[in-house]
Amino acid sequence: MELIRNFKYSGGFFGHYEELIRDVVIPYQERILNDEIDGIEKSHSLENYRLAAEKIETGKCSGKFYGMVFQDSDVAKWLEGAAYSLCLNPDKSLEERCDSVIDLIGRAQEADGYLDTYYTVLCPEKKWTNLEQGHEMYCAGHMIEAAVAYAESTGKEKLLHIMCGMADHIYKRF
């Protein structure tokens, strides 16, 4: 992050794209993750985390998982992008929204550290049964990248601790 923090520019090529990502892409992607855009297929990404948290907390789900087996990675990539944006342009509102998503992710984590909404909500009996196509490692890797970026840019380590729990789970499993 020091390299990003030390990177200075004013306008030009990089300035244009940094502003576009900060002002358009990150807010739009957040609205997509929250299913707030009419006329397009719903992402259900954050809703899947809500369902997983509900299942962890109550043992039941009031809805169904929707999306691809790798749906969680969309949330991870948004958090990572937001973290890099926060590093260059502190934004209290964006940081608070990220913190809220991180709280939800923590609630969706199983007691043994496992974190993947597809398997928690839809088919827990199939965890780790298809390493090639199951995308558990893929989603974990993206969320670990987000956790590191968020800790580096904000100094907050909650997501990092959550993902250390998942890394410990993977280590014990394999």
PLM feature segments, named:
Residues M1-F174:
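Glycan-recognition and catalytic cores of secretory/periplasmic carbohydrate-active enzymes
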